[in-house]
Amino acid sequence: MNSQFTIDGLFPTPIISSNINRSWTEKELALFDYHKDHCHNNMGNTTSNDRYVLNAPEAKGLVGFIGQGIQHYVDKIICPKNPVEFYITQSWLNYTKPGEYHHTHEHPNSIISGVLYIDADRDHDKIIFHKANRYQQIKFPQTEFNYFNSESWFFNVGNGDLKLFPSSLTHNVEQKKGDNVRCSLAFNVFAKGYIGAEEELTALHLRM
């Protein structure tokens, strides 16, 4: 008998990936360089003092690209029935020198979070995501890792890469390897409008 078997992944965690597919403009580069000199120590690396970087006029092109990614996430993943507008709340730049790292964390008070990589070495730089429930009742040593048996998963990242993911998803950056100063633009996304349903006693009007 020649049987065929299929595997379905129920309730998966979405990670949306894209790339801006262009070089940074002179104004954008000037913006990144400015914040590099105006930052403070974070847990393992440094973060821009400005927590609303994407509000700058020089970031208009970045906002347009990121907005397309957010809309794709909303249309394909969330699929809201009611009119809801998703918008960027805060945005900041992270700078990670060789030997530094970015601590394990999530993003509270946010629905979608994302990272746009400004300066990243694809051979060395990565983002690591962690499974929400890492408890394993029985732990088997694996011959190979896949989406079903892994407690964490990483993606190599390079210049212009964009990652969007649920804000509740735990992530971190290991100790930086390579020679470049890794620069990434992180942001949070929330919603305004009508969510839930009156007949289900879940109606809520979110206003900015």
Indicate residue ranges for each PLM-predicted region.
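Beta-strand secondary-structure signal
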Residues: 17, 113-115, 184-186
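A short alpha/beta connector and helix-capping loop motif
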Residues: 179-189
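Non-heme Fe(II)/2-oxoglutarate
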Residues: 1-81, 203-208
